[in-house]
Each structure stands twice: as structure tokens, then as C-alpha cells.
Design a protein with these regions (language model features):
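Sec-dependent N-terminal signal peptides
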Residues: 4-13
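N-terminal signal peptide c-region/cleavage motif recognized by signal peptidases
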Residues: 15-17
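Surface-exposed acidic/polar loop and edge beta-strand patches at domain peripheries
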Residues: 21-209, 221, 232-269, 282-402
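An amphipathic, aromatic/His-enriched active-site/gating alpha helix that lines ligand/cofactor pockets
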Residues: 229
Length: 402
């Protein structure tokens, strides 16, 4: 029965892909583990695109046993993710531009070496170096002790190895690649949330999509939260770089961020002693409830854009951490169901959502690497069309206090 449930969950993500080849890289149900593995367009006898997909098992230090999967498209992007770390994306490169950042954490840390409750619930930071981290799903946000327990920073899912991992490649052009995983947050008497993740990419393109299906497998309703913590450093982030998004309002996360409210749209150079500033946004969307947020370099010819649905992800957080390059010069663009306040505050302010027993919900995001001025201009035009003539409201008082 359990195996049937797993296969059924993965099947939700397979519909419409009849003419495709697939490979199971990991399966906890069947005891499958491919370890080091590779497939190439040449092996598949594809002549009009050149690409490869490779899984490697890492060794040494705290990355011992961690797995990474890399998609390499000769005329497009190189995308690297880690099944060991909740299917998080490590970095994306292409056209001389990178989406990602330089963390002091250099290894792909195996969660077996992380205690999430260390440093008063900040143990999550010991592995934090990814471009995209799923923060959730049982809870997310800053750590807090409540209800006789520690709600650690940004939840657990980013530190749970995937139980099922598969690769699928369409046999016909444009040869769409799909990397799927199943990540389980299951604790006796507490929670049974399972997330079927999917990354889809068409070789040669400058964008990819995430499609995640969260299912409550328990017999009782359960709360959930999610923040897609998406992080960008150099060469996109620099002095004079800009954050753009159509928003109804912006407010500082805390009193410290008040000092940066007037300059929320621009970034400083690496600055020693700079503490992080966080801003909360209420995003605007088009008639289909779609919106976009982006960080653009000073010259306006490089950037990273995220498109998402505001019904699925109704709030947006922007994290400025323009500290030194060694310490971590990075900004986060974070669509979510919640802001980054502790779950206790998010619950009080009615942003924590609930899934009924057996119910599923899904999240769809598209990431685009902008590598010329025309692409940047198109995103700016799209933001302006949604924003209209009304300027964002700047609210000086934080909506909550930790």
C-alpha cells in the first residue's frame, strides 16, 4: 500500500509525458540507489541538442555521502541540485552569469552532520549555501520556543534527504528534462506531510520551473508554511543593483530595517558590519494572479527573475545581507505563504495555512537568468504593467515584533 501511495504521488507529476525515458536514481521503497550515474544526449541519440545529466556522490568533511545532480546544457544553463538536502538548488550558471552566492559554508553538508536545535534553533545555518531552499513545510520562519518545543529556523524540509528521486527526458523535441523527488516530513503522532518536487528544464533555454505538490498523508488536518528562499550574490548583486517587483506595500521586518526603508529598492556595496535587513511586501499580480520579482545589476544587463502565483504564495520577503564577500554578500527574494516571523506570530496574524487529511496543494515558480539588457527591459516592462500608476505604500511600522 505504501509503495502504491508513493507511485501515485509521483504520477501526479508525470501526466502528459507519455513519450519519455525515465530512470530511478533513488528509491527507499525498493532499496534502489544508483550512486554515481550519468546520461547524455549522445547516448540518447539526440542530435539537435547537447546536454547531460549526472549524479555524483560527494566525499570528505561534512559533505560525506551527499549527492548532487547536475544538468548541463551546452547552449543553456547548468543547474545543480542536491537530493540529500531536500532537493534544494545549489546554483545555476549560464551565459557568463551565475544565480547563487558565496557562503562561508563551502561543502554540500549532509544533514546527518547538522543539529537543527543547536545555537538556540539556528543549526540550519550550518548547511546554508543554496540558491533555492525550501523553508517549511511543517513550519518556517525565525526560531521560537513554544508549545513545549523548539521551532527551529526555517523548518526541516531542506535538511531531509529525498526518499525517491527520478529523472525523465522527453524523447521528442524540445527534450524537456524533469528531475523529481519525494521528501517526507513524517513523525509518529505529529505530522505526515510529503512533498513531491519537480524541476523542469528545456535544454537551451534560460529559465526553469519548480512544481511542488504538498500532501497531508495523515488522518488529521495539519498546518503548513512555505518560503522559497531564493538567494543571489555577485555578479548580479553589486553596489547600485536594484530589486524590482510590483507591490501594493512594503514594510520593515523590524526596527533595524526601518533605517533602510527609503532605500529598499537598491543595494549597497559589500559593507563590513552590515547586519541583515528584511522587508515585507504585499505583491500585486496580473489578472491570472501571476507576478514577478527580480534583482537587476547596476548596468541593467544581468539579473535573476522569479515568477509565481499569488494565490499559492501570497506574500513576498526581500532579505538584504550586503555584508563582506567572505561573510556572505547576498540578497534573498522569498515568495511564500508566510513572512519570516516565528510561527507563533504568523499563526496569530492568520498567515499559517492548513491542509485537511488527504488534501494536496501545489506551488509553481519559474526562475529566469537574465543575461542581456533586452531581457532585463522586458521584465521591467512587465513589472510596470502590473504596478500601474500607483506607487508602493511605504509603511514605516513593522507589522509584528519578535
Amino acid at each position: 500500500m505504501k509503495k502504491t501511495l508513493v507511485l501515485s504521488t509521483l504520477a501526479l507529476l508525470i501526466s502528459g509525458q507519455v513519450c519519455a525515458k525515465s530512470w530511478v536514481l533513488t528509491s527507499a521503497e525498493s532499496g534502489t540507489e544508483q550512486g554515481n550515474w550519468q546520461i547524455t544526449s549522445q547516448q540518447l541519440k539526440i542530435k539537435d541538442q547537447t546536454f547531460s545529466i549526472e549524479q555524483k556522490v560527494l566525499h570528505g568533511g561534512k559533505q560525506e555521502g551527499s549527492k548532487v545532480i547536475t544538468i548541463i546544457s551546452k547552449n543553456g544553463l547548468t543547474i545543480t541540485l542536491s537530493p540529500t538536502r531536500g532537493m534544494n538548488l545549489l546554483h545555476v550558471e549560464g551565459y557568463g552569469v551565475r544565480m547563487g552566492w558565496d557562503s562561508p559554508v563551502k561543502e554540500v553538508v549532509n544533514p546527518a552532520f547538522i543539529n537543527l536545535e543547536s545555537r538556540n534553533g539556528l543549526g540550519w545555518l550550518e548547511g546554508f549555501n543554496e540558491m533555492v531552499v525550501r523553508c517549511g513545510y511543517e513550519w518556517t520562519g525565525h526560531p521560537v520556543t513554544a508549545d513545549g518545543r523548539i521551532y527551529t529556523l526555517h523548518g526541516k524540509v531542506g535538511n531531509i534527504p529525498a526518499s525517491e528521486v527520478s529523472v525523465e527526458i522527453s524523447e521528442k523535441a524540445p527534450y524537456e528534462i524533469r528531475i523529481r523527488g519525494l521528501v517526507k516530513e513524517s513523525t509518529f503522532k505529529k505530522v505526515d506531510l510529503q512533498t513531491a518536487t519537480e524541476l523542469s528544464y528545456i535544454p537551451g533555454s534560460n529559465s526553469f520551473s519548480l512544481h511542488d505538490v504538498l500532501t497531508n498523508h495523515a488522518d488529521y488536518d495539519h498546518d503548513y508554511q512555505i518560503i522559497y528562499h531564493s538567494n543571489f550574490g555577485t555578479p548580479i548583486l553589486e553596489e547600485g543593483a536594484r530589486f524590482i517587483a510590483p507591490v501594493e506595500s512594503v514594510s520593515p521586518f523590524n526596527d533595524y530595517a526601518k533605517g533602510g526603508l527609503k532605500n529598499w529598492q537598491t543595494y549597497a556595496a559589500p559593507t563590513k558590519g552590515f547586519d541583515e535587513m528584511v522587508f515585507n511586501f504585499k505583491p500585486l499580480a496580473d489578472s491570472n494572479k501571476q507576478t514577478v520579482a527580480a534583482v537587476i545589476n547596476k548596468a541593467g544587463d544581468k539579473g535573476a527573475a522569479i515568477s509565481f502565483n499569488t494565490v499559492q504564495l501570497p506574500v513576498l520577503t526581500m532579505w538584504k545581507n550586503t555584508d563582506t564577500l567572505k561573510q556572505g554578500y547576498v540578497t534573498g527574494i522569498e515568495p511564500g505563504t508566510s513572512y519570516a516571523y516565528p510561527v507563533t506570530i504568523e499563526r496569530e496574524q492568520k498567515r499559517v495555512k492548513s491542509l485537511a487529511a488527504g488534501q494536496s496543494t501545489h506551488f509553481d515558480l519559474t526562475y529566469t537568468l537574465l543575461h542581456n539588457a533586452n531581457q532585463v527591459a522586458e521584465v521591467e516592462k512587465h513589472v510596470s504593467s502590473i504596478q500601474g500608476a500607483k506607487a508602493p505604500q511605504e509603511i514605516e511600522t513593522p507589522i509584528a515584533k519578535e
